[in-house]
Swiss-Prot record:
It comes from Aeropyrum pernix (strain ATCC 700893 / DSM 11879 / JCM 9820 / NBRC 100138 / K1). GO terms for biological process: transcription by RNA polymerase I; transcription by RNA polymerase II; tRNA transcription by RNA polymerase III. NCBIfam families: PRK01099.1-2 (NF002207), PRK01099.1-3 (NF002208). It comes from the Archaea. This is DNA-directed RNA polymerase subunit Rpo6. It is found in: Cytoplasm. PANTHER family: DNA-DIRECTED RNA POLYMERASE SUBUNIT K, DNA-DIRECTED RNA POLYMERASES I, II, AND III SUBUNIT RPABC2. GO terms for cellular component: cytoplasm; DNA-directed RNA polymerase complex.
Length: 89
């Protein structure tokens, strides 16, 4: 990882959860059983999918001078758990 922290920033996390919750609210199928997420609420399901790295999403981080780096959500969640341990939620 060359750009940014080895975990999702609060802005990246909020954006992904918001977009996914919107998708779920207009009828997209959840990638997990809602019972595993503990709720049928689209926001709770979206949080569960993001926090467990289930979504097939890539984050693209830009450099000020141009260029950037693409990182998968599952890899960022994995790195965050290695670094932050139980503090990562």
């Amino acid at each position: 990882m060359k750009i940014g922290p080895p975990y999702l920033t609060k802005y990246e996390r909020a954006r992904i959860i918001g977009v996914r919750a919107f998708q779920l609210s207009i009828g997209a199928p959840p990638l997990v059983d809602p019972e595993r997420a503990g709720s049928r609420n689209p926001l709770d399901i979206a949080r569960y999918e993001v926090d467990n790295g289930i979504l097939p999403v890539s984050i693209y981080r830009y450099l000020p001078g141009g260029g950037g780096q693409s990182l998968s959500l599952s890899r960022l969640v994995e790195l965050a758990r290695e670094i932050l341990g139980s503090e990562y939620v």
